C-alpha cells in the first residue's frame, strides 16, 4: 500500500479476500468505509490531523523502521522528519537528581538538530518536553491513551506549548 503497488480496487479485493477467508468472519467493506468517513469528519471538526504511513513528508519516518508500524496516526501539530529523533524516558516519580539531569541533558542536546520525543506523562516526560520548549528545541509527544486523554491534565497547557513551538502530539 505504502509503495502504491496496488490501486484502491485491488486493495479492497485483496483485503476482502484475506478477511473473508477467515472461517466464520464476515466483513462489510461499505460499513467500514462509512465508519472511516465519519471518523474523518470528526477529526476535521476537532482539528485533528490524520497522518498516513505512505505520506513520506509528514509521517514519522522512524516509525516505518519498526517491525509493526502503524498505518495511520492522529495528531495535533506537526511532525519534524528533518531532525534526529531522540526518545527521553524515565520515572513518573522522579528524584530531584533525575529532574536536574534530565534538564541538563535536554538543554545540552538542544544545540543540535535533535527532536526530543516523550510521552507527555508526569515526571521525566514533562521535564523533557518543558525543557525542550524552554530551549527552543523541537519536541513531539506520543500519547498512550489518545489525543483526548492528556495525563496529567495539567500537561494540557504544555501540549499547547509544544504545538505553539512547532511540535505536536500524536496517537494511534
PLM-predicted stretches and their roles:
Residues 1-57:
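Short, small/acidic-rich helices and loops at N termini and domain boundaries
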Residues 38, 43-46, 50-172:
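Glycine-biased, small-residue-rich flexible motifs in mid-sequence functional cores and linkers
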